[in-house]
Amino acid sequence: MNKYFFIGIGGISMSAIALILKNQGFWVEGSDMQESATTKMLRENGINVYIGHDESHIHGDETVIYTAAISKDNPELLAAKRMNLKIYERAEFLGLLMKDFKNVITISGTHGKTTTTSMIGYILKKANYNPTVLVGAFVKQLGGNFVIGSKEYLVVEACEYVDSFLKFNPTIGVILNIDNDHLDYFKDIDSIKNSFKKFAQKIPTSGFLVVNYDDKNVKDIINQLNTQIICISTKEKTDIFADNISCSDGYYEFDVKNNNDEILAHIKLNIPGFHNVYNALAAFAVASKLGVESITIEQALSEFRGASRRLEKVGEFNGIYLYDDYAHHPTEIKATLATLKKISEGKVLAIFQPHTFSRLKTLLNEFAESLQLADKVIVTDVYAAREKNVFGITSEKLYLKLKEIGIDCEYISNFEDIACYAVKEAKKGDIIATIGAGDINKCLDIILKKAVVKS
């Protein structure tokens, strides 16, 4: 029996891959730095998880898969190298796994991957296509961050960071948008566009590629591709486009039309935000091309309730609404705040935790500009993730920049202090929103506890 060991098994993607292999009958175990809901769930599914990394965990007869987040001197990785074991980085191994599937649907883009992947997975599940789905967040309607199905359809996010998606073997692709991000790896927007072009070129002539025709950077790269291209738009008549778009309290509905101006469906989204119109169009285009009936797609998209940490309403107290969003790029923050302003007539208090020093340094001015949409901003310390601060940047610089352009803001480092301030500051009808890809959502739990004590 093949054996697999996952270094960093608690990660959202690593855990899903581990469970797929376990479901296929393989021996699987792994390690992670700390206990979590994910490690608990893995154990419940029969996977042994070590807490902490130690060379004794590697027995010498397994294939080792590691996440890019671990250090090069990880003792388990070093032990595997000494033993000359087969070793794969996560994306590389996922690319190999894709060869087992007939239709591999890969969703790329700087923004919107998780939601669109979830939408496509949910549509195919509802249509009884029995898909296997890997998604970068917990999705209630999918029962988690993965669905184990047949080998007919695999639906998976395709991230451009460190060119990960170039290790994939897709048959169907989606490019939602291309924006300036991951500039700790990419030199500039042209190098990002070049990476996406290489990804698009991986789609075989027998497959197809769905692209956002309203995105200039996407438009720049789709020339001279040998695969079938399906264009989506909210602005002009393309292969699949949205028409008669209307909005009520941040929630959108629209007709889906083809390039003959025929109405294919009417979608009434149950998740807020104009950006989700594009995500829904992409999901519609993929599912429709795969033969799912329009009425089934319409029903699924209208039922879809979103993924965790994607404009997620977490709770409320005293008429004050609490939202959490994973936005960690200025474009995403603008979309999030614009949507929140439509949801309630009250003020929006944004609690922002920058994600990585490199991103904050590169996009400092853009972050300041995007946060102007909030009525009040609390900035807290940078969530370092994989980085050390060798960039000479701190959250205080963002705070000072916001002050400089006249934004009502505070810099508060401690989550307890943030919660106290937010509970005191917010009034009935207001929205408190945590924004960032780190652990800033923990603030909302503290806020709810303090609100109960206060009331």
Swiss-Prot record:
Class of the enzyme per the UniProt entry, highest EC level: ligase
Matches recorded under InterPro entries: Mur-like_cat_sf (IPR036565), Mur_ligase_C (IPR004101), Mur_ligase_C_dom_sf (IPR036615), Mur_ligase_cen (IPR013221), Mur_ligase_N (IPR000713), MurCDEF_pg_biosynth (IPR050061), UDP-N-AcMur_Ala_ligase_MurC (IPR005758)
GO cellular component: cytoplasm
Reactions catalysed: UDP-N-acetyl-alpha-D-muramate + L-alanine + ATP = UDP-N-acetyl-alpha-D-muramoyl-L-alanine + ADP + phosphate + H(+)
One example of a Gene Ontology biological process annotation: cell wall organization
Record-listed ATP binding positions: G109, T110, H111, G112, K113, T114, T115
Leader sequence segment: none
The enzyme's E.C. designation: 6.3.2.8
Record key words, sorted: ATP-binding, Cell cycle, Cell division, Cell shape, Cell wall biogenesis/degradation, Cytoplasm, Ligase, Nucleotide-binding, Peptidoglycan synthesis
One Pfam family it belongs to: Mur_ligase
GO molecular function: ATP binding; UDP-N-acetylmuramate-L-alanine ligase activity
Family statement drawn from the similarity comment of this UniProt entry: Belongs to the MurCDEF family.
HAMAP family, per the entry: MurC (MF_00046)
Protein name listed in UniProt: UDP-N-acetylmuramate--L-alanine ligase
Gene that produces this protein: murC
